[in-house]
Curated annotation (Swiss-Prot):
Subunit (UniProt): Homotetramer. Forms an RuvA(8)-RuvB(12)-Holliday junction (HJ) complex. HJ DNA is sandwiched between 2 RuvA tetramers; dsDNA enters through RuvA and exits via RuvB. An RuvB hexamer assembles on each DNA strand where it exits the tetramer. Each RuvB hexamer is contacted by two RuvA subunits (via domain III) on 2 adjacent RuvB subunits; this complex drives branch migration. In the full resolvosome a probable DNA-RuvA(4)-RuvB(12)-RuvC(2) complex forms which resolves the HJ.
Keywords linked to the UniProt accession: Cytoplasm, DNA damage, DNA recombination, DNA repair, DNA-binding
Protein role: The RuvA-RuvB-RuvC complex processes Holliday junction (HJ) DNA during genetic recombination and DNA repair, while the RuvA-RuvB complex plays an important role in the rescue of blocked DNA replication forks via replication fork reversal (RFR). RuvA specifically binds to HJ cruciform DNA, conferring on it an open structure. The RuvB hexamer acts as an ATP-dependent pump, pulling dsDNA into and through the RuvAB complex. HJ branch migration allows RuvC to scan DNA until it finds its consensus sequence, where it cleaves and resolves the cruciform DNA.
Protein name: Holliday junction branch migration complex subunit RuvA
Region (Domain III): 155-203
Domain of life: Bacteria
GO biological process: DNA recombination; DNA repair
Family in the record: Belongs to the RuvA family.
SUPFAM superfamilies registered for this protein in UniProt: DNA helicase RuvA subunit, C-terminal domain, Nucleic acid-binding proteins, RuvA domain 2-like
Keyword DNA damage: yes
Positions of the UniProt region annotated as Flexible linker: 143-154
Lineage: Bacteria, Pseudomonadati, Pseudomonadota, Gammaproteobacteria, Enterobacterales
Amino acid sequence: MIGRLRGIVLEKQPPLVLLEAGGVGYEVHMPMTCFYELPETGKEAVVFTHFVVREDAQLLFGFNNKQERTLFRELIKVNGVGPKLALAILSGMSAQQFVNAVEREEPAALVKLPGIGKKTAERLVVEMKDRFKGLHGDLFTPAADLVLTSPASPAVDDAEAEAVAALVSLGYKPQEASRMVSKVAQADASSETLIREALRAAL
């Protein structure tokens, strides 16, 4: 089991990051709320990981802290919620925002996320609220504001294409993803900025 990685950020292709640790390059899937906080390419990063083994693939999911990883692990225990949907949930809102929505019993806040229908949202609220009773401490500490640390801005067309591709990988339909990015498009914006603003506008 790989639980933590410390290494150099080689590539950033939202929501994937390629992290070199001990001479090995690890492809790590990260929620966008965690991806925003990665250092620039060439710098060292530390991520807490969850390893998923499937018949057709072995996937590594990464998080900035243990609390985010704990929430991810609790999410994938819910019936009908797999790693991909859990990743989409934590990309659309921070861990603390999700906890708040569940604690306040607001399934409507979850329906706005890709792949979440009314029944799934209601099930998440019921099941996760029960699970939260056994979780205390930092998971309920207000999350810090997200900080974008990406240095250079790629060409606008490339940035928009990357943003659309990232949203599609999170569960949005191509047409919807393109529309979301177009609404927040701005000159010299990086793909990470476009993704963050598109997800924020969708809530």
